[in-house]
Amino acid sequence: MLRITENELSADLFYELYISVGWEPPLKEQIAVALNNTIAAFTVYDDNNNPVAMARLIGDGGMSYYIKDFAVIPTEQKKGIGTMLMKHIENYIIKNLKPNWAVSLELISSKGKEPFYEKMGFEARPCEWDGAGMFKMVRYTN
């Protein structure tokens, strides 16, 4: 049976899961800082206690949450793990909301993965209310 843990994701495990999906990883020191400043980090383990997915939830805790580093290892994709993890994240947010609160939940999809997120209720940008999402990497220079 799959199991999800909260806030037990180490920098080393993050690194392993990150590269498993073909992403160029940040430095482990940078990962550790990011994890330390994350609202919640989620790790999914399979029946054999092998890590198969992760995600981080960042944001202000009041009006806006952002899903970052949502990754399911390629051999375990299309098995419902991502759906289970996304539902877990949404339930985590809901149980931490105050009465009458509504918050935005945002993310940037990997190319080609948009249908998964749309199935989970996310709306692509631009749309009727919003323009295109924007992205910029800022790098250290001396």
Predicted regions span which residues?
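Conserved acetyl-CoA pyrophosphate-binding loop and the N-cap/start of the following alpha-helix
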Residues: 76, 80-88
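Alpha-helix termini
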Residues: 93-100
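Short amphipathic alpha-helix that is part of the acyltransferase structural core
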Residues: 1-29
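C-terminal "cap" of GNAT-fold acetyltransferases
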Residues: 6-7, 100-142
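Conserved acetyl-CoA binding element of GNAT-fold acetyltransferases
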Residues: 63-74, 78, 132
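Conserved beta-hairpin
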Residues: 32-35, 39-55
